Amino acid sequence: MPPLAPQLCRAVFLVPILLLLQVKPLNGSPGPKDGSQTEKTPSADQNQEQFEEHFVASSVGEMWQVVDMAQQEEDQSSKTAAVHKHSFHLSFCFSLASVMVFSGGPLRRTFPNIQLCFMLTH
């Protein structure tokens, strides 16, 4: 039977990683209860909103230019997604580093007295 300490360190290391890597199903994909994918029809309010978004115009000098509001929303959502992805990567790296530091990680072999000094002072 292997010692319990390495298994505990491995569990402490894997739990934050597994929590950070949660995978959520997409809206269009069938869930675990659904075997088939159903097509949803948009309501009249959504159709009206799409109609208004596509026919907004702006004045540029003496010329009129059609502005596609849906395209602007897609650009904004892609920028927001990039920011969220970057912040997720940053938090993942920080969590991984903190787990390695607090569990001893590679510092345990190099500096074995760090843990002893910490235990003596606290």
From Swiss-Prot:
UniProt keyword annotation of Acetylation present: no
Chain spans, region Disordered: 27-51
TM region(s), chain numbering: none
One CC-aspect GO term: extracellular region
Residues making up the signal peptide according to the UniProt record: 1-28
Superkingdom field: Eukaryota
Assigned keywords, A-Z: Fertilization, Secreted, Signal
Function statement: Sperm protein required for fusion of sperm with the egg membrane during fertilization.
Listed name of the protein: Sperm-egg fusion protein LLCFC1
Organism of provenance: Homo sapiens
Lineage: Eukaryota, Metazoa, Chordata, Craniata, Vertebrata
Annotated gene: LLCFC1
